[in-house]
């Protein structure tokens, strides 16, 4: 009987350690100057140039890419960052500016590293604009991280590096 209690406690401790790691929120030092910071920790899994001469991707995906870039520009870059369970899941504003729009879309929960299928996942789109730039941060839920929290509201001013949400 004692070994059952030991196994149970071991599993509880593992789950608690995982949750503490998953919800960690270390302090960040935001670089000064005219630059853009990454909105998320993780690994860049793709960079898509949407200009007419560069956009050569699988048939069927091009329409989804155009939907993602709606409200920004005809020519831009889509940078996909995959967050593993061991990365920080807090999202930050890549630029200083004003939140121009927020759009939440219900969807599926496919694996986040599958770029093509992740377009169908639940998502939250935040457009931030300043005098020189307009940036869209798209928070996409996945198989493990299924909830999206948005910390900002429309017309709210944000600083570069400020917390804007969590996946």
Where do the language-model regions lie?
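Contiguous, well-folded functional domains in the mature portion of proteins
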Residues: 1-167
């Amino acid at each position: 009987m004692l070994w059952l209690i030991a196994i149970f406690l071991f599993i509880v401790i593992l789950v608690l350690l995982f949750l503490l790691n998953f919800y960690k929120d270390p302090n960040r030092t935001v670089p000064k100057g005219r630059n853009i910071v990454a909105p998320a920790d993780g690994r860049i899994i793709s960079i898509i140039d949407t200009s007419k001469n560069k956009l050569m991707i699988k048939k069927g995906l091009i329409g989804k890419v155009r939907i993602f870039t709606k409200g920004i520009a005809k020519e831009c870059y889509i940078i996909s960052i995959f967050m593993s369970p061991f990365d920080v899941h807090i999202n930050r504003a890549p630029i200083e500016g004003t939140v121009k729009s927020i759009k939440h879309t219900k969807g599926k929960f496919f694996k986040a590293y599958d770029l093509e299928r992740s377009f169908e996942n639940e998502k939250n789109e935040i457009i931030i604009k300043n005098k020189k730039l307009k940036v869209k941060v798209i928070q996409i839920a996945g198989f493990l991280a299924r909830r999206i929290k948005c910390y900002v509201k429309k017309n709210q001013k944000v600083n570069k590096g400020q917390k804007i949400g969590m996946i």
